[in-house]
């Protein structure tokens, strides 16, 4: 298994929908979660870059599909956050459409990191996201973010509860506690990404006429 250097990750582009993304080949691992789950912070912590992914105090700022390249053909994708109430309905529909299209049609999507606040895990949309990935044979890593907000005992209890709950999905779903602030769980995230990028088969580019 190759240990990739995530500090070399660089921003490639932002796209409103999959039609504006580059060729659908290689391997992509997407980060998904509710608007305040800490996706951008997790990406910045993983790559040890303070501003690779723009963090915001205002949930719902990630409205585009943001693409980052680790090395050639291996990409991380920051998906639009879901489930934030204070967003105009039309805008919300547009994001959800872009999100759904990416999840359903992007062939190079091979792994999904679902982030959820450890204090409020497994909301309906989180469960739908895991269910969809399992049905699509996509491996899932659940990160319970903001783990530093709970004392050790409560953290362990939440972790065990979620691990127990995801068994019902009957899929390849791993659950870890994560804290961008304390750098907890970053090694587990790196290990999982390394295994996905090393072991999953990259998608070949479709040539015109195929």
Curated annotation (Swiss-Prot):
Keyword Nucleotide-binding on entry: yes
GO biological process: division septum assembly
GO molecular-function term, one example from the UniProt record: GTP binding
Binding-site positions, Mg(2+): 40, 62
Domain of life: Bacteria
Entries under PROSITE patterns matching the protein: G_ENGB
Alphabetical list of SUPFAM superfamilies matching this protein: P-loop containing nucleoside triphosphate hydrolases
Record-listed GTP binding positions: 33-40, 60-64, 78-81, 145-148, 178-180
Keyword terms: Cell cycle, Cell division, GTP-binding, Magnesium, Metal-binding, Nucleotide-binding, Septation
HAMAP family on file: GTPase_EngB
Stated name of the protein: Probable GTP-binding protein EngB
Organism for this UniProt entry: Salmonella paratyphi C (strain RKS4594)
């Amino acid at each position: 298994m190759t240990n990739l250097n995530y500090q070399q990750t660089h921003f490639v582009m932002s796209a409103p929908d999959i039609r504006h993304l580059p060729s659908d080949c290689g391997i992509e691992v997407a980060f998904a979660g509710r608007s305040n789950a800490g996706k951008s912070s997790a990406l910045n912590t993983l790559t040890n870059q303070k501003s690779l992914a723009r963090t915001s105090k205002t949930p719902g700022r990630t409205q585009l599909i943001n693409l980052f390249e680790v090395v050639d053909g291996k990409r991380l994708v920051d998906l639009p956050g879901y489930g934030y109430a204070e967003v105009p309905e039309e805008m919300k529909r547009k994001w959800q459409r872009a999100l759904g299209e990416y999840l359903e049609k992007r062939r190079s999507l091979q792994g999904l990191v679902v982030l959820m606040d450890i204090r409020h895990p497994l909301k309906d949309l989180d469960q739908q996201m895991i269910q969809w990935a399992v049905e699509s044979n996509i491996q899932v890593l659940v990160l319970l973010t903001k783990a530093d907000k709970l004392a050790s005992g409560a953290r362990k209890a939440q972790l065990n509860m979620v691990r127990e709950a995801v068994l019902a999905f009957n899929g390849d779903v791993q659950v870890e506690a994560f804290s961008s602030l304390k750098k907890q769980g970053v090694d587990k995230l790196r290990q999982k990404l390394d295994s996905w990028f090393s072991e999953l088969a990259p998608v070949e580019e479709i040539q015109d006429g195929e």
